Amino acid sequence: MHASRTCGTRTPPASEGLSRRRAGRPFAAILDKTRITSAALEIIGRKGYDGLTMAGLAKQLEVAPSALYNHVTAKRDVLQLAEDHLISMVDVSLFGRAPWEEAARIWAWSYRDVFAQHTSLIPVIAVLPVTNAPQTLEMYETVTRAFAAAGFPQNLIVSSIVAFESFIFGSAYDVTAPDDIFEAGSTVDSTPHFRAALKAGRVNERPADTAFELGLEALIAALARSLC
């Protein structure tokens, strides 16, 4: 009796059934903070900070906005993720292993180079609280510990870090400044001294690097003198 009920009915192989169940379900990468950060930086790189919206970010990730809000609650959270990701790329490896001047030099050059590629984020990140930004806080802890060990007065350590960052962020803009930024145009005859200095400075192949090195060495030297 059992055989007669199943007669003429083909039982599909397990693999066929699995294939059918999967039809119409394309593979989707797992949404996590790493993907969110990468997508946010891509949008900011194309459209600037103002072009980053939660709706646009969800669209870039090909997810519903509700899925995005399972990981971040607002645009500010996304910016903190972006900040922390960029800061994690800054080289602090020499702090605690080399003289503070050498470590600060490598740190500053690395810091500038990272943010020269993301200048649209500087106005936001420069004033963004570091709450819940572990990589950023770890960087500050590393630099603070090294400065304290070098003899920096504790009440001046944070001010010293801010002095570095103020210079670094401004210099990051200089890396991408247009070549004709100092051209005087129709008023050229009224600035003969500046014009001569500008012409002389053109011998420098990488003027942004020359300016950064000049300012960085002056800052390090001034801080070193204050420790004497």
What are these regions (language model features)?
Residues 1-31, 192-205:
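N-terminal intrinsically disordered/low-complexity leader segments
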Residues 137-188, 201, 223-227:
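Hydrophobic alpha-helical bundle segments that form small-molecule/ligand-binding pockets
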Residues 92-138, 164:
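Hydrophobic alpha-helical connector segments
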Residues 209-228:
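C-terminal all-alpha effector/ligand-binding and dimerization domain
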Residues 35, 77, 106, 138, ...:
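Amphipathic alpha-helical interaction segments
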Residues 35, 39-77, 81:
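Helix-turn-helix
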Residues 83-89:
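Short, basic, alpha-helical segments at the C-terminal edge of helix-turn-helix-like DNA-binding modules
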